[in-house]
């Protein structure tokens, strides 16, 4: 959250509005989605194409024995992964983007109005989601975990949207006479 705070202070001084805070969250969550899931799935897609076209053998043939064995082991894991798990990454990213939008609004609110409790709420919320994910991942099936996180994010979005709607929007500037 300190990164959000610094970015808003440094780069959004003149444009710090509640709407821009939401867009900051969309950008933050979106780039994280691209960097974490997007690039991985492009790699998975390229690998699947190589396997399905039969060109994987030629690629494996260029590797030394140890690297080839490790690559074959990775391919086996990829090929035996249940297909719904690839879908679950998308569900997880939806929750993550919603979280980043909400966190960005809370940090904006703390900065814009000096309401430090919203900054601490953002920090606590981010910690709680990350901690719950780590703790539950070892004991709860992935589908249940993602549904729990999705439900939690729905509640967070509802609460933050109430704050957002309660905040007055600035009056539109009057057109200057020509």
Could you say what each language-model-derived stretch is?
Residues 3, 37, 41-45, 78-83, ...:
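Juxtamembrane/disordered regions of integral membrane proteins
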């Amino acid at each position: 959250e300190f990164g959000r705070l610094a970015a808003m202070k440094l780069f959004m001084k003149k444009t710090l509005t509640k709407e821009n805070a939401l867009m900051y969250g969309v950008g933050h969550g979106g780039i994280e989605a691209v960097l974490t899931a997007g690039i991985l799935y492009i790699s998975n897609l390229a690998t699947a194409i190589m396997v399905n076209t039969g060109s994987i053998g030629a690629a494996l043939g260029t590797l030394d024995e140890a690297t080839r064995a490790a690559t074959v082991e990775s391919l086996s894991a990829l090929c035996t992964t249940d297909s719904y798990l690839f879908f679950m990454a998308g569900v997880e990213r939806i929750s993550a983007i919603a979280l980043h939008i909400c966190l960005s609004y809370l940090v904006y609110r703390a900065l814009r109005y000096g309401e430090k409790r919203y900054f601490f709420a953002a920090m606590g919320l981010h910690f709680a989601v990350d901690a719950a994910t780590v703790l539950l991942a070892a004991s709860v099936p992935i589908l249940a975990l993602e549904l729990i996180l999705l439900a939690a994010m729905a509640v967070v979005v509802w609460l933050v949207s109430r704050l957002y709607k309660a905040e007055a929007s600035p009056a539109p500037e009057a057109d200057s006479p020509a």
